[in-house]
Amino acid sequence: MMENLQVNQREKKTRHSSRQCRRKGLVPGVIYGKGINNFLFEIGELELNHALSVTGEHGLLSINSQEGSLNTLIKEVQRDPVTRRVLHIDLEKVEGNEEIETAVPINYVGEEYINKLDAVLQKNLDSIKVKCSPSNIPKGVNLNVGRAKPGDQFKIADVEFGNEITVVDDLNSIVASVSYDQKIITQEVVDQEVAENRAKKES
């Protein structure tokens, strides 16, 4: 799904101007790509947040401005590490239905079942790079880890994509692995040592 957004052109590209922009409830951004000069813009934070909730952070946006309309791909969303508010957004112009490379977020499904095993899921990747036409970009891809047990690993090859999508990343790359929770193991060892010491004192 492609969201339509109205943006306003901005002239300056300085830290001060970006801070001023954010104080007004606006988010600074840039559009770049083949055949165009970098286009600096600002957009309402609320409008952008709504669009990101629909498309995800690697989806498509139709941008309307004084210069006309452009179809774009979200390339990067910079967020404040504490508040998670959007600080800046980078967009790339896309041409028709020409294939493009983008990152697709991984949704880990069934992680709660791993936690019940006193185990943890170690996530090596949060997205996978793919190549496809703009209309076929998925908002995300699911990886079911619900039946995994400690020692299991998941590779990119274990993630299912449609035939219209080509995976760019190495299929043998480890996406995630399951291991015992070291905190629980450590606590069990401590409890055992305490029990053994108590038994020695009582004997």
UniProtKB/Swiss-Prot annotation:
Disordered, as annotated region: 1-21
- Which GO molecular function annotations are given, in alphabetical order? 5S rRNA binding; structural constituent of ribosome
Q: Name one GO cellular component term.
A: cytosolic large ribosomal subunit
- Give the highest taxon in the source lineage: Bacteria
> Which Gene3D superfamilies does UniProt cross-reference here?
Ribosomal protein L25, beta domain, Ribosomal Protein L25, Chain P
Bias (Basic residues): 12-21
Keywords from the UniProt entry: Ribonucleoprotein, Ribosomal protein, RNA-binding, rRNA-binding
- One GO term of the biological process aspect: translation
The keyword rRNA-binding is assigned to this record? yes
Q: What does this protein do?
A: This is one of the proteins that binds to the 5S RNA in the ribosome where it forms part of the central protuberance.
Q: Which family does it belong to?
A: Belongs to the bacterial ribosomal protein bL25 family. CTC subfamily.
Q: How does it assemble?
A: Part of the 50S ribosomal subunit; part of the 5S rRNA/L5/L18/L25 subcomplex. Contacts the 5S rRNA. Binds to the 5S rRNA independently of L5 and L18.
Q: Which NCBIfam families match?
A: bL25_bact_ctc
Q: What is this protein called?
A: Large ribosomal subunit protein bL25
